[in-house]
Amino acid sequence: EKALDDLLERGSVVQEQVANVEGCYLRRCHEAETYVCTRVRAMLADKPDKLRGAKKIIDEIERAQGIEYAPLQRQAVELAAQEELLILTGGPGTGKTTSVRGIVALFERMGLDVLLCAPTGRAAKRMGELCGKEAQTIHRLLGMSWNEQTGDVTFTKNEKEPLEADAVIVDETSMVDLALMRALLAALRPGCRLVLVGDPDQLPSVGAGNVFGDLIRSERVATVALKDIFRQAEQSAIVRSAHLVNEGRLPELQNTAASDFFFLPRRDSVRLVDTVVELCRTRLPEKMHIPAESIQVLTATRKGDTGTAALNRALQAALNPAGAGRREKRFGDLVFREGDRVMQTRNDYDVLWEREDGTAGAGIFNGDVGKILQIDPSGELISIAFDDRVATYTADMLAELDMAYAMTVHKAQGSEYRAVIFVSAPAAPGLMVRGVLYTAITRARELLILVGDDVSLGKMAANDRRTRRYSGLRWRLGNGGTA
């Protein structure tokens, strides 16, 4: 209690009665939450200019794209013309991408400047490919930089220097934490439309807050929830399995040759790891023509015989062994080798990178995945390609990297892979939950293989326990709490 009093006196924390509970916030979180509430309220109160003739233009878009929107899809596109703030949700196969394409087309035909963004580089790249328009990370869109002396993150785009956009569309919004949402809202000029797209059944953001869920559950923001699975998507066992898990049911585990979903029962951990290695090294590349680089192994945990650490050791030895003229550098328990798939494990705003076209910048972020291109003969400089950016690391910066042949489901959020192998094995109770299994399944685009035991799968599907997030945003929005 004395420690709390000291923090209150110093202004490090803020106490406030929130929904009949005595809340205690870090000051920065309290400021972010109240700011988000204030901006959202302002957007809800502000009636934007109706986009006249929108319905006629939507008809033209349907004809041009050779489609007919389902009723809820059309509702989403029409609401985008009417609302300053719109939420669009839906699971796999429900037509979110088609709806977003329609919203983009409508905005552009009405002469609006539209920006697309997502929380991670992979999610932004995927969004851009699906929408046929460049998408950026939210960090890059806002011009994020880091003050080395104060440790503060700043953004060049803010209230004083807002984004030059009439509309901003955000994908994978469930991953956006409170601080990043605060920064995004601050960068929107008055009247700018904001469309938040995502799947609320995936895991929440790593950082503080549950912004997407709070906005939906406040029932103050116009929301379209796409529910129906389209016939074409319904043919995918991946899509069907995701929706079964979301309903608390176990996926169908009977394998058929024409399926995009397979279950390989393995109870013994040694045999399980051997199976994963065999799938990545030979079976999928040779039988299904899926190269190892397009396969991502996912698991719930880092620890244990079937955690990411053990899987990465086995996969590195099989897919990128020592020798063959590949230089390597040992750091701690890991050996980094030319050709290895690696992942950044923390935000580093100082890492310099360059693209082939000569553009350069700084910053590699938590969860970014790359490939080691070259280790110089001294072992002191390492070149790593993160998609289209090549970054140079010094040897001491290897502390920020981990192997990425296998990764936790949490780290895979916002990404999509041609093939996913999910390791189903006992883990800590907090990880044996439906959200982890659902998120793992929905990372797969063409092929999903579950390897492990059906008991663990059943426990995960049945366990709807969610990580509790203490937040006052829903209360502030829904009950008129003070901002």
Regions found by a protein language model. Give the residues of each.
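Interdomain "pre-motor" coupling segment immediately N-terminal to P-loop NTPase/helicase cores
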Residues: E1-G53
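ASCE P-loop NTPase helicase motor core
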Residues: R74-V77, Q82-T256
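C-terminal accessory regions
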Residues: E247, R355-T359, N366-A483
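Conserved helicase motor core of P-loop NTPases
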Residues: Q75, C192, P200-G363, L373, ...
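Conserved SAM-binding loop
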Residues: Y69, L116, I169, V297, ...
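Conserved pre-motif I regulatory segment
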Residues: K56-L85
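Long, charged amphipathic helices and adjacent flexible linkers at domain junctions
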Residues: K47-R63, G325-G332, R465-G480
